[in-house]
Amino acid sequence: MLVIGNGRMITQDASNPFLENGAVAMDGNTIVMVGVTEEVKKVYPDAEFVDAKGGVIMPAFINAHEHIYSSFARGLSINGYNPQGFLDILDGLWWTVDRHLTLEQTKLSAYATYIDSIKNGVTTVFDHHASFGHITGSLNAIEEAAKDLGVRTCLCYEISDRDGMEKSRESVMENVNFIKHALADDSDMIAGMMGMHASFTISDETMALCNELKPEGVGYHIHVAEGIYDLHQCLKEHGKRIVDRLHDWNILGPKTLLGHCIYVNEHEMDLIKDTDTMVVHNPESNMGNACGCPPTMRMVQKGILTGLGTDGYTHDMMESWKVANVLHKHSLCDPNAAWGEVPQMLFEGNAEIANRYFKKQLGVLKEGAAADVIVIDYDPLTPMNESNINGHLMFGVNGSMVQTTVCNGKVLMKDREVLVCDEAKVMADCRQAAKELADDING
């Protein structure tokens, strides 16, 4: 038994949203009680007690779109790299990195990403992986890191024809084999999806192969209209818009997650809504790659299930929230834009996305939900109550303030110390692997 208490509790449970001095009791991987600290301690007097010391207790974060393979690009300088547009960024940086990744480097990239996620209070990660230098077994390598560190993750491999049809088919099979493996796993900690890069690097032949081989019970995870070229190529080569093409290939549906969706029109948004397809917004990436601002507020208003990701830019979901908030205010010239929509995406949207792949209810502190809890070192200088929670979180909190992270009932970090690995050794191994990758890229 584990009890975390003596903190301001944000539950994300509409029936009981805020407790001034709250506690949460966990038995194994399940929350068994949420209430006032003294009452919870009376019911479970012998439980291990973690003192939040007046900080914020809340559900752990979920990242709905991540790129583990990008970990070693931090600080990387590639000879001759001078991008003039999004395609140059893809080919000159990201595809260059993924073509050189070894299996061991992929695994260490996963350790780096998951450790940083833990330190930012993220316990569930939807990753979209690519390592065309070594495809087969890459998802199992990432899974090993996830299991070792105790995080929950949904994985896929980025199918693409960009490096030839042989590697494209190998990437299809990497997805198929991992999905079957994940479906047979009863831990509720591992899931798989059919990963796809984007429409403009996937032929009809490959689309057909994916349709033929995709196991039942899962959907696709694909970038959609992230750059304008993706749309232009689809119109020119296929005579239709991207979402229409995906619909024609039976890609859309309640288990499918579309990343970005910058260049989509009203008809496409209606199609996404009608098929109950999920969308994930990645604000920092869209801005950093100069791709544009998606009509995310319109999607949320239409009732499309929309979540929030980071696309590898950060592992701090609070940072992604802050950026999304100002991006849409700036883009729409509306000071009211994004105030309610973005936290809805982060908390409600990401939780619903995760619950389409994991059985235990995530993203909420209530009886029967998953024991995924974080403690944040935040002492508000103004009154805090259920009516102003989001204002406190957005303006007062960042990921580095997370003190304790619990996933599936296991304490992964306490008082900023990662307990599930030798962090210093892992980081040293990562630095060496990153140097070897950079040396290999630059020859």
Predicted regions and their residues:
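Alpha-helical scaffold segments that flank or form the walls of functional sites
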Residues: L76-H128, G133-V151, M173-D185, R431-D440
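Active-site microenvironment of metallo-dependent hydrolases
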Residues: M1-G22, M26-V32, T37, V43, ...
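Divalent metal-coordination and catalytic microenvironments
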Residues: G7, V24, N29, G54, ...
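Metal-coordinating catalytic core of metallo-dependent amide/deamination hydrolases
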Residues: H129, H134-I262
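His/Asp/Glu-enriched, well-ordered alpha-helical/loop segment
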Residues: D248-I251, K255, M297-P380, M394-N398
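Glycine-enriched alpha-helix->loop->beta-strand junction motifs that scaffold or abut catalytic
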Residues: G150, K214-G219, I251-P254, L271-V280, ...
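Active-site gating loops and adjacent loop-to-helix segments of metal-dependent hydrolytic enzymes
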Residues: F72-T106, R162-G164, I228-K255, T275-M278, ...
